[in-house]
Amino acid sequence: MNEAEMLFSITVPGSTANLGPGFDSVGMALSRYLKLSVFRNDEWQFSAETETVAGIPQGTDNLIYQVAKRTADRYQKELPPAHVKVWSDIPLARGLGSSAAAIVAAIELADELCGLQLSESDKLHLASLEEGHPDNAAASLAGGLVIGLHEEGETHIVRVAEADIDVVAVIPFYEVLTRDARDVLPKELPYRHAVKASAVSNLLVAAIMSNDWALAGKMMRKDILHQPYRAMLVPELSKVEHAAEMKGAYGTALSGAGPTILVLIEKGKGEELRKQLSEHFPHCEIAALTVPSEGSVIERNPLEQVKSV
């Protein structure tokens, strides 16, 4: 097998969700990536190219295959076999959108292999059906920052192309599974709490749309929907929040269900904050990230395109 036999590659950014009170609605792309290199093959095979994805299922029990197969079946198409090399620096089960990136990549994979000619709206809805909510998937698909709502028959998003901030991620080395993070949430909220949560979330979105990140950071601290309950699973949260506030950051929030903690800070100050937080949290990976404006990208092998002419 050589590079000339490669059909195409798929690159998908990771993501964060919620930013505090934007629960299951606000998503933002992050500069960690999943890349699939797709080759002709007689049977389905997945091989890991980085330590991050070492141990992934190598056959049809792989999540990427399963989502691609469901996508092809939905359009009554046969999914031809391929060898997929998987490269990723998105850590698994850390709240950085690894599963959403895999789902988006799988839908792109089915679209390319089966010639489905899916629109971005189609891809978004299919990914949201898989995820149950649009935040991570929409950010990985479209890039930038998104606010969305998923319903069974339709998925709606509004995209903010430019998030003019730096992001520093504090990534603990332990995992928090989404189902465990869901289990600690209350089954219901008192009405007055729901009203306050709605107001805080509304103001968060208004601040984001106005590029008022200082106000957005204040609203991130006022979340009452999930972070107060999930804090018990991530003991670093309050410590990172305090340290970041002392360094002049806009705001701090759990990334998705955690355990990664995101700190938003003025553009150009991310690397300095990364160094400072590294001193305080030596037991965590501290990464300076950006918000890519571009989402998933397909690169086709020009030699394969010539063959198909």
From Swiss-Prot:
Catalysed reactions listed for this entry = L-homoserine + ATP = O-phospho-L-homoserine + ADP + H(+)
Biological process (GO), any one: threonine biosynthetic process
What is the protein name stated in its UniProt record?
Answer: Homoserine kinase
The record's disulfide annotation reads none
Similarity comment text for this entry: Belongs to the GHMP kinase family. Homoserine kinase subfamily.
Q: Under which pathway is this protein filed?
A: Amino-acid biosynthesis; L-threonine biosynthesis; L-threonine from L-aspartate: step 4/5
**Localisation per UniProt entry:** Cytoplasm
- Function of the protein: Catalyzes the ATP-dependent phosphorylation of L-homoserine to L-homoserine phosphate.
User: What is the organism of origin for this protein?
Assistant: Bacillus velezensis (strain DSM 23117 / BGSC 10A6 / LMG 26770 / FZB42) (Bacillus amyloliquefaciens subsp. plantarum)
The UniProt record gives the binding positions of ATP as: 91-101
